[in-house]
Every structure is written in structure tokens, then in C-alpha cells.
A protein has these predicted regions:
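Active-site-proximal beta-strand elements of phosphoester/diester hydrolases
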Residues: 1-14, 97, 141-150, 169
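Short beta-strand scaffold segments in enzyme catalytic cores
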Residues: 84-86, 97-100, 134, 218-222, ...
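Structural motif
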Residues: 34-35, 143, 166-167
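Short Pro/Gly-enriched beta-strand edge/turn motifs at strand-loop
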Residues: 80-86, 112-121, 200-206
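N-terminal glycine-/serine-/threonine-rich phosphate-binding loop
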Residues: 1-35
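CN hydrolase (nitrilase-like) catalytic-core segments centered on the catalytic cysteine
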Residues: 60-81, 152-239
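Cys-nucleophile CN-hydrolase/nitrilase-fold catalytic domain and related Cys-dependent amidase chemistry
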Residues: 24-103, 175-198
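Active-site catalytic loop in hydrolytic enzyme cores
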Residues: 89-163, 177-187, 244
Length: 244
């Protein structure tokens, strides 16, 4: 199975731009890979929320929204599975979720982040987390997703360790300075990933509308046995295809 880690650019609050970026990559990689993986909250952008539910309920979308349907149609048309982060609205709650669509355009997994680090501490019950990890099948592989901070909790490592899968997908939004990631932080992530005792595919997005030194600047890697088996560095947009 070929998995392409898309460490590419997004714009906060520009869901149309981000949707078109996903669909453009689906078209570009038709016949070249089996799964395209994008980072956490890629569809709306990580910093798109105000933490006022009356405002944010119009930014978050349900998995049945037309924007999701458009991406499903592209996946079906180009026979390519895709997984991307989005800010999900379900009933009266908002989640940081990762949606995976197979190459027939069918949603096969909608994972809700279980750790609270995606939101500020002062939020009310409208901002929520999921409660468990799920195993799903794509092609001939069984897959588990953990979003960003999920994999830094011992309890979550234990939960995943009790589940059987071929690999773990680790979409994130991290805002390390790109030099810090390239020189030090990636090794800490490789070590943490080794606790899962299976290949872990990491991808971070690239923020196009914020120019601070400590902001998401891409980067993607295959971690296995505490090692970085393959990678593209942080600091510029890029994609890397991993064969599992």
C-alpha cells in the first residue's frame, strides 16, 4: 500500500481554498498512490475558531455537509482514498476530527480527537473530544488514527497497544520553529512513536497566512522502531509517498 503524506499549505477560515487543495492533490495523485493523508484540521485551518459557539457553529461542518460530499465525489472519480482533518459539528458539539474516505467515495472512518490540547481550557461543553480509538480497513491494511497530542498520553498509548493494526496514522498541527523540528523535535516524536511497536506515519500542515517564526511549517515522516525511516523536512510544502 502506498500512502502519500501531504504536508501542504492551508489558510485559516478559507474552507473553499483548503477543499480545493485537497481535491487538486487527489487529481494529481490519481494512479500514483493509494491514500492521501493531510494534517489535523486542514479543511478549516487550526486557528479558525473564536471559542464562541454561536460563531464557531458556522465554521465547523458535519460529515454530511456538501463540502465533504464534494471531496467524496473526487475520491470516487479518481479512485483514490483520502484522509484529512476538519472541525466537525455534530449536534451541539464541535470536535477536532479526522475523516477518511475510501477510493469509492465512501466514509470509512470519522475519528474524533480524544485529547483536549486542540482547544483552549476555558471552553464550555460545546467543545468536546471523542472517547476511543478505532481500527478500520483500507485496501489490505488495518489502520488506527491518533491526532497530534493523543499519542503523548500514556493511557492512549496503552489503549492503542491493546488494538491490532498494521500501522498508525499521526496527522498533527505542530507549530515548532522549522529548524527546531528538523534538528531536535523529530527525534522525540520518533521515540514516542516507537511505543506503539508498529509503523507510524506523521504529517504536519503548512500555514500560509501566518508568518511567525513558531508556526506550522510542514514536515512528514515514517517512524519505525524509534527511527526516522523516511521524511521530508519542515520549512516548505511537500509530499512524500511511503510504501507500507
Amino acid at each position: 500500500m502506498k500512502i502519500t503524506l501531504a504536508a501542504i499549505g492551508f489558510k485559516n477560515k478559507d474552507i473553499e481554498f483548503n477543499k480545493n487543495s485537497i481535491i487538486s492533490k487527489i487529481k494529481e495523485y490519481e494512479g500514483k498512490t493509494d491514500l492521501l493523508l493531510f494534517g489535523e484540521t486542514f479543511l478549516q485551518g487550526f486557528d479558525s475558531l473564536s471559542w464562541s459557539f454561536d460563531i464557531d457553529k458556522n465554521i465547523a461542518i458535519s460529515k454530511d455537509h456538501k463540502i465533504i460530499s464534494d471531496i467524496c465525489e473526487a475520491a470516487k472519480k479518481h479512485k483514490l482514498a483520502v484522509s484529512f482533518g476538519y472541525i466537525e459539528l455534530e449536534n451541539d458539539k464541535i470536535y477536532s476530527s479526522q475523516l477518511t474516505i475510501n477510493n469509492k467515495g465512501i466514509i470509512v472512518n470519522n475519528y474524533k480527537r480524544v485529547s483536549p490540547g486542540w482547544r483552549i481550557k476555558e471552553t464550555d461543553y460545546h467543545y468536546a473530544e471523542g472517547s476511543n480509538f478505532q481500527v478500520f480497513k483500507l485496501n489490505d491494511k488495518s489502520i488506527i488514527i491518533g491526532l497530534c497530542g493523543d499519542l503523548w498520553y500514556d493511557t492512549n498509548i496503552d489503549k492503542i497497544s491493546k488494538l491490532t493494526s498494521n500501522l498508525v496514522l499521526w496527522p498533527v498541527y505542530t507549530d515548532f520553529n522549522y529548524n527546531k523540528w528538523n534538528n531536535t523535535e523529530k527525534f522525540a516524536y520518533a521515540k514516542q512513536a516507537s511505543l506503539l511497536k508498529r509503523p507510524v506515519l506523521y504529517v504536519n500542515s503548512y500555514c500560509l497566512d501566518n508568518f511567525e517564526e513558531e508556526i506550522a511549517r510542514g514536515g512528514a515522516a515514517l517512524f519505525s522502531n524509534g527511527l526516522i525511516i523516511d521524511e521530508i523536512p519542515s520549512g516548505k510544502e511537500g509530499c512524500i509517498t511511503i510504501k507500507i
